[in-house]
Amino acid sequence: MENLGFLIISTFLLLFTTLLPYSSASTTRRFHFNVEWKKVTRLCHTKQLLTVNGQYPGPTVAVHEGDIVEIKVTNRIAHNTTIHWHGLRQYRTGWADGPAYITQCPIRSKQSYTYRFKVEDQRGTLLWHAHHSWQRASVYGAFIIYPRQPYPFSGSHIQSEIPIILGEWWNDDVDNVEKAMMKTGAGAKVSDAYTLNGLPGPLYPCSTKDTFTATVDAGKTYILRIINAALNNELFVAVANHTLTVVEVDAVYTKPVHTKAIMIAPGQTTTLLLRADQLSGGEFLIAATPYVTSVFPFNNSTTVGFIRYTGKTKPENSVNTRRRRRLTAMSTVVALPNMLDTKFATKFSDSIKSLGSAKYPCKVPTKIDKRVITTISLNLQDCPLNQTCDGYAGKRFFASMNNISFVRPPISILESYYKKQSKGVFSLDFPEKPPNRFDFTGVDPVSENMNTEFGTKLFEVEFGSRLEIVFQGTSFLNIENHPLHVHGHNFFVVGRGFGNFDPEKDPKRYNLVDPPERNTFAVPTGGWAAIRINADNPGVWFIHCHLEQHTSWGLAMGFIVKDGPLPSQTLLPPPHDLPQC
């Protein structure tokens, strides 16, 4: 199975050479995804795994900035499915965004749907994944946008690129894991392994052969495209004996940041430069381990792979030499932070700044038209009568924003909005501030009432509005780092802090010069984060925690951007093959 690691790398090398790293030309690129079962073995455990085209991870979508993309998805399983193109803005094409019951009804068994959209003013590393129940545990892949212009990275010529997709593996059927969690009201069973490009590596049982390996030449520079497709865990990543240079996050160029390790949340991407500055013939660990802020059970293991330097070995000793090199690499200390190292996670996140050059300006709104402040909370709900619940104190776990636990409707919100048939589907009364003001991060999690309301509540803004959303963490049950993803828009993280947000003092300390531009960000443990959005994309857009367990519990909301005054500022009509509920 080690050959699978080389297969993934060679596929990317082929893309790197057939799709030039930059091009001013654009075209229509077509792909076909078959969602299907595939028998896969990991950790000495064989099971039917949900895949795209039988691949785990799924196929890479590689396009150029300005391309029109058509991806036909055929559902070959008995369950409904959808695919989300994570981080793609979908300007005026919300029908192609993918979250089930938000922008489309799911694709039914034996049916197909073609996602059509244009890649406009975006370049870099993104991802795609399933967006129905917990299918994205194995249905995911890289989405690479090559730029019109040369990379702005200074320094050495780029030799090639290496994709590294982080994931999780369960020996159990993940659908059953989710169902058990929702039935019992308890937390989900943790994964059995973390993976690098679908491979757990030699620290897990029966997995020496299932180890990711990338080959480099000494003296050359490589692009590492790091994608966190894990279901429920933020991760630290490092390469032994190497300094990494961050040059892009979430497909947006950044000022260079030199670091020994990174923290990356589910849904985030980080593009790094790795200079192969070690001696030929060596091997070095690349490792990922969780960043933990939760009191809930978690997988505390580490996945590793290898960066192998080319170099001649004597034929008669090649196997033994390779084994000795690998043992030496395994004994090398990797500069991974401690799993509880919030200080490092905070410092790293704060170090990321937008490039802010003349060619790639930072278009952060310096003034706002609307501010929404929302709490993000884990909740406990009373157990229904005649039912046993396994959550804390015999209750059920839920989650909420401003004490509203999001409920998906039985039909698409976008379609009902477009047809002006919202009655009974959703309402536009999401509270724009917490219903009660209290010490959000100092509350006693035992004595407080942690019940929540349920609903499909959104808020609405005018086209072109300059929107600020402040996400306030709470200490209900646990203070925790929440990675939140905004669909349909990039945003600027203008402020972050610990404790409670102060609307008078904290905005005075905002970074309105070069804040990081992202599509997914982490609200600090026991703190808050403020983002600003240029709301210039008409449609219905989902905001949710990218820890899938929390989304299932209701940690989500949505907002609507109304049509603008010009034809080019209006939502396009639905496609003819849009799935029906």
Swiss-Prot record:
Residues 1-25 form the signal peptide. Keywords: Apoplast, Copper, Glycoprotein, Lignin degradation, Metal-binding, Oxidoreductase, Repeat, Secreted, Signal. Residues 34-150, 161-312, 429-565 form the Plastocyanin-like domain. Cu cation 1 binds at residues 84, 485. Pfam families: Cu-oxidase, Cu-oxidase_2, Cu-oxidase_3. Cu cation 4 binds at residues 482, 545, 550. One of its GO terms (cellular component) is Casparian strip. Binds 4 Cu cations per monomer. Its cofactor is Cu cation. GO terms for biological process: lignin catabolic process. This is Laccase-1. It comes from Arabidopsis thaliana (Mouse-ear cress). The gene is LAC1.
